[in-house]
Amino acid sequence: VNYQAVGSGSGRKAFIDETVHFGATDDPMKESDIAKVKRGMVQIPMTGGTIAFGYNNPGCDVKLTQQQAVEVALGIINNWSQVGCDDQKMLWVYRSDGSGTTAAFTNSMQSFSKTWTLGVGKSVGWPSGVGAKGNAGVAGVITNTPGAIGYVNQSYVKDKILAATIQNKSGQFVKP
């Protein structure tokens, strides 16, 4: 078995094109995609991965309300001083490829606040920031860019990447 983490969009295409025999995604296939699979398929629900706000600002313990999380992703909050850290420009990093991680992340952002304007999907029109391919690409940009913040699968929160805590509905700040 040779599994390649290429992102949900690329993985779906490879499965539909019959260049792979199986795949995994954070965003289940829709009927329109399933209809394109000529050989047939079985979709099996499984546990999803946790998504973290990963950041590179080692001197700051980041705690975001749900509204602040949305404002970071929209580029409204663009300086670390706006979330209680030292004055430093914040760089938003997002997935540039079609991604189940993006679909799950944007779904959360939409549930957090009515000010979320980008909708929900594997790809959205980010108003600012830098795109990178795959979780590994986003993690690479965050690791190599002081002040960067973005969304990644929790397994990428290591070394220079820290995880922000997010306030839940009951008011507690929790790590992913």
Which residues does each predicted region cover?
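Exported/periplasmic ABC-transporter solute-binding proteins
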Residues: 1-176
